[in-house]
Amino acid sequence: MSEHTTTRGASDATIRAYDAADFDALVGLIGAAFGGETPDSVRFAVSAPNTTTFVAQRDDRVVGVSMAISFGASAWIGNVVVAADSRRRGLGQALTEVAVAAARGRADSVLLLALGDARRIYSRLGFEDEGLYGTWQATDATAARIEPAGALDEGRRIVATSAAPDLAEHAVALDRWATGEDRRAYLELFAPSMKVALARGDDGAETVAGYRTRKPWGTGAVVARDAATARVLLCDLLREAPGTRFEFPDANERGVRLATELGLERFKENMRMRLGRPVAGFTPQAVFKALSPAVG
């Protein structure tokens, strides 16, 4: 296990690879920082085969974490957290540097979603702004604006992959078209619980026009080729999970209009930032909900 000793002012910490004994500390750190995280979600994050996790340890205590998630030609930096009493000592930057070094060994493009003051750290490391992601949540007006099941189809129907497993492969292909990334390693783990939107053409043939994922601990991505498909998927999701928060690019103007029509309110924003080459083929207009803040 490689170790990197980092000194920042009065802060001496060892940054090393994650060990299973660190799990409870990570649940506490990540949960306190982001809220809504569960042991299941953290367990998935640290055990995913394409993820490298680092922790910062001072004495016998884990005081920080960072992750590098690889999707081949692209990679994401996620879950960068430092304990409250260890901040403003350079440890967040050190954790990010280690994760970036791991990611750049495999990827041409390294991406992340930065919140607030963290953007300054990433800018110092060479990351460039690519565009804001707004986070939206339901209001008191939302329930009345969600169409009942079956009331809104517009030539579309939703099919669960549990009933039609072959559709999951089409959803993975659609995700690659939308994101420009090969996220199969993550999506295949959620394949049995996907829902796919099929659109009927003038000739009567159906094609995959969108999908949404459901993770064991909560909701996941919503990707759609058009606003009508997105509306069907979002209404279906909000009927199932009314408290869902939607994080998607501001560049998706159709998504902004749809969220507003559904009575959602934008209450937070993150900046998508990039180190290295732009992701060829990224289509923000097709992303109506990010898979997670850690991987966009």
Region spans (language model):
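A short, well-structured alpha-helix characteristic of acyl/acetyltransferase catalytic modules
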Residues: S2-A10, D19-L29, A144, A149-G150, ...
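Active-site rim helix/loop that mediates acceptor-substrate recognition in acyltransferases
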Residues: S2-T6, F23-M67, R176-V196
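Conserved beta-strand in the GNAT
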Residues: V55, R61-I69, S74-V81, L198, ...
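Conserved acetyl-CoA-binding loop-helix of GNAT-fold acetyltransferases
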Residues: V82, R88-A101, A227-R239
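Conserved GNAT acetyl-CoA-binding A-motif
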Residues: A103-L115, A241-D250, N270
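Conserved catalytic-core motifs of GNAT/GCN5-like acyltransferases
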Residues: L111-L113, E128-T142, R266-P278
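Conserved active-site tyrosine of GNAT-family acetyltransferases
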Residues: I121-S123, F127, A259
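Amide-forming acyltransferase catalytic core, primarily the GNAT-like/NAT-type
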Residues: F127-G218, A228
